[in-house]
């Protein structure tokens, strides 16, 4: 039966680097990603998968059962956790066998999870800005939840559409006596292979780095200009901004290395040493970025007082009394941030 391995170094990032090399007279020693992968990737992916799935399932439980989904930010946070779960589900299969359908499924889950996470981070940031700008009166109470649901559906649809190019061009290919899910241009696609590799790289950089960085920077600068921002500090503002900052810090190194690897001829980085270092940088930064799914639940626990309270009660760390679901808890235990700071 045909087997393939989907590993972080097997995606089009490193493949681009290798296939776009110009024919050089000197023989270059290519970076051997398998050496590091054999030692680190299985244990790292297993740890990230277990921790990330448990953390994000706990977030889903608390949001759905206890905090409720009557606030727009909770709807976005729930979808953000689902995005992380989609991404995490691909990790165990980076070193396991499968067939052509499995390749498509893994590619779809991986990129849909990544793109949707980016979009929900942007939606959270914009929502916090609108709350701050309009003091919670931008929408009526009856329109808040429907607006959150509609924008969430649009975010998922956009993420799926953004993933279609990867879904089409990835196929199992024989490499090192086993099949790997890698870039392979389909004959019916227009333009040449180099064009599509450049296109996929730019799409990745714009969606995962440029777009969220622009939105975050622009809105944060606008908020910093007001006196009210310095006078009023709410934990949810800190939480949303921390989520975005961590996401950018985790994925920016990989996107930069990925971009330089793809367009290295344009930056005079085609020599042996530069190519080797770029391959290594892409591989290592990709592994680091993979761990981002475990960070968000930790931010909730440290920066969201309501979430940490529910979390502690779930584990009976502060109280042995049963935690009541939303709508049944007493006023003293269900108090969250003031309405003018948390609702749109």
From Swiss-Prot:
Tissue-by-tissue expression: Expressed abundantly in immunal tissues such as spleen, fetal liver, lymph node and bone marrow. Strong expression also in lung and heart. Expressed in almost all hematopoietic cells including monocytes, macrophages, PMNs, T-cells (both CD4+ and CD8+), monocyte-derived iDCs, NK cells, and CD34+ progenitor cells. B-cells expressed isoform 1 but not isoform 2. Up-regulated on synovial neutrophils of rheumatoid arthritis patients.
Induction: Up-regulated by CCL5 on the pre-B-cell lines NALM-6 and G2.
Ranges of the Cytoplasmic topological domain: 65-74, 126-144, 220-238, 308-344
Segments of this protein annotated with the region Disordered: 324-344
Function, as annotated: Receptor for CCL19 and chemerin/RARRES2. Does not appear to be a signaling receptor, but may have a role in modulating chemokine-triggered immune responses by capturing and internalizing CCL19 or by presenting RARRES2 ligand to CMKLR1, a functional signaling receptors. Plays a critical role for the development of Th2 responses.
Additional facts recorded: It was initially reported that CCRL2 responds functionally to CCL2, CCL5, CCL7, and CCL8 via intracellular calcium mobilization and transwell chemotaxis although no evidence for a direct ligand-receptor interaction was provided in this report. These results are now controversial, and other studies failed to confirm CCRL2 recognition and transwell chemotaxis of these chemokines or a series of other CC- and CXC-chemokines using CCRL2-transfected cells.
Family membership: Belongs to the G-protein coupled receptor 1 family.
Protein name, as recorded: C-C chemokine receptor-like 2
Organism expressing this protein natively: Homo sapiens (Human)
